[in-house]
Amino acid sequence: MRLDSQLLARELAAFEAQHTRRRRQLAEAFPEPGDPTAVRVGGQVLRNFCSNDYLGLSHHPELIRAATECMSRFGFGAGSAHLVSGHSHEHHALEEELAAFTGRERALLFSSGYMANLGVIGALTDRHDQVLADRANHASLLDAARLSGARLRRYAHGDMAHAEQMLLAQRAGGETGESHKSNGAGTATTLIVTDGVFSMDGDVAPVSALTALAQRHHCALMVDDAHGLGVIGASGRGTLELTGAASQAVPILVGTLGKAFGTFGAFVAGDAALIDYLIQRARTYIYTTALPPAVAAASRAGLRLAREEHWRRERLHTLTLRFRAAAAALAVPLGASTTPIQPLIVGDSAWALALSEALMNAGFWVAAIRPPTVPAGTARLRITLSAAHRDQDVDALADTLGKLWREKSAA
């Protein structure tokens, strides 16, 4: 336990010396109505290139109207957990619409993606089980596996051969998979978990290969598609649609409402038995207040717009290609991502911070991502695009990056 103030001060000083101390920037206002990409920070209006508002829906008037009208009927707070008195018509309708959108029997709302992952993995695994995870997975998947008590094994990022080696080694070690599980879920399992789109690199998981791997080794597969749903796939149904993976081959699908859909919260989609079981066993669902009904109402509006307005995804894809082409022409070495997440890996944390500050001085908000969020030596700018960005802002960002990168290379 670290409650000694001097010890805490020394650790904070160490973070400072390593250029890894985290600080918050204060967003003061959004000065252009309906435009989520212009934000005032420190008295300066910046173009935001580090949010996850991929479709530009967070300020959409239909979301604001839906939330406002709902508040006139339900008030603001839910007042209770879903299983007491907090489950409103808006929550229930949103769950049904999310289930239909993802092609599942049912969906279950959680207060955040972090809580969804903790709730699902904690409910389905225990110390008798194994969680096999991509090394680049989101921190919530890693924490969920650790807290569940299951044996956590991590394969090299995107490396299906390594993942299979781990499963074969488990079998060769004589682990039969039989147990008497305290959570009542039956025999021991291996749960394979992966991001759909990896949040720091922007690459897409090899979901089709993972489904084949899971079937060969009789494992369950869980995909957290927080950065894929609403963004990729012909109709916005995410990584599974893009990769052609069958929904029945991925029995556990996690999604978020706080990115493409422009609101807040998360959900798990699956068959009726899975959702009913999570209602009984997922502690992060049972023991917390439900999302405000107004958030659910706004989420329904965001989901409808994401489903119907295909031009938003098309616009986002066009801007992504535009930015990558401009960066390539200026010799800015972006990572190999085809999604709106465009990483520029610079390696050194101090340089990442300096580059972020230089961009802010030029009118762009791009956060520096440093260890331990990313591996040592891979500090980066995590540039994210939105359908709400203007062509001229994307071009100006690329031009500014090109200038800064040339200065770095010449130093």
PLM regions: where:
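Conserved active-site segment immediately N-terminal to the catalytic lysine
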Residues: 218, 238-257, 276-280
